[in-house]
């Protein structure tokens, strides 16, 4: 028999997207480790043909294994979070049946291009991750992930000197492209910028209200 939710507010669903290698899984790992003592968390990861991100999150100890579900999307990972999000909506439903009092459901998309966005039916807040190693031109390329996500994370700023990227140019371009929407620059692996991301989730998601 499925347990009923005892908390007043519904769970907050946070979508984490971005190109392959940008640091989505690392961000998710760091968020889980930093927030798990204060909030009831579950996570859903998307991969095209494997459950590699689920395995990585489990090995890292981000959350207990039963709180992490891997979804194999097949084909285009964009479709599974936007046009036909049914596979992920079903995964959310299954996780909430097991953990009805979850405060946050993290949904990590499979690596995709700059046009990827989450269906509003699937995600309440969207975080889009790009990285400095992709070049300083990435923010000005635009695309819904960069311009329309609730929070943009420009990751791996520590690599800027090694790839010839100007953080000043990236910051200026991000500010122009975002049109007032927030963005964070940092290196989530070392924890730089993580507190800002958590504060954003807590404030915009009204956690603890």
Curated annotation (Swiss-Prot):
Disulfide bonds: none
Molecular function per GO: GTP binding; GTPase activity; nickel cation binding
Domain of life: Bacteria
Record keywords: Chaperone, Cytoplasm, GTP-binding, Nickel insertion, Nucleotide-binding
Primary location: cytoplasm
CDD domains named among the record's database cross-references: UreG
UniProt xrefs under InterPro entries: CobW/HypB/UreG_nucleotide-bd, P-loop_NTPase, UreG
Keyword NAD: no
Binding site for GTP: 18-25
Cell compartments where the protein resides: Cytoplasm
GO biological process terms, semicolon-separated: urea catabolic process
CC terms in the record's Gene Ontology section: cytoplasm
A Pfam family this chain is assigned to: cobW
Protein role: Facilitates the functional incorporation of the urease nickel metallocenter. This process requires GTP hydrolysis, probably effectuated by UreG.
Family from the record: Belongs to the SIMIBI class G3E GTPase family. UreG subfamily.
Quaternary structure and interacting proteins, as annotated: Homodimer. UreD, UreF and UreG form a complex that acts as a GTP-hydrolysis-dependent molecular chaperone, activating the urease apoprotein by helping to assemble the nickel containing metallocenter of UreC. The UreE protein probably delivers the nickel.
This protein's name: Urease accessory protein UreG
Organism field: Cupriavidus pinatubonensis (strain JMP 134 / LMG 1197) (Cupriavidus necator (strain JMP 134))
Name of the gene encoding the protein in the UniProt record: ureG
